Amino acid sequence: MSYTGDEIHSISLKDAGALTKRYRDQFSVETPYIKGEYFGKTALLSLLSQTGCVGTRIYYGLKADDTQCLVLVGVDGDGNDMTTGEIMEVGLPCPAHCSEANDLNS
């Protein structure tokens, strides 16, 4: 399958809220977990501006201390990870770097 970078991925806030709530509901109050991560615009544009990059793939990771994280890598037009390019992980996790309460995080 080839990728162009013009694929549409939008969903409604209602659908997005249902997805994130289902994820949050699988954890108990005592179990720490990551709701999301913040990545800055400059970092994302740097990843996406690599030659041949048409999008990004986001992998779920687990750090040595068992903290969840996201790993971002550019994807080329053939759908392959651009593993010789820039790869990102150091996002700012929520919690502690959360938005005000909304349908996606509360």
Question: How should these model regions be labeled?
Answer:
Residues M1-S106:
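Detector for the mature cores of small, proteolytically processed
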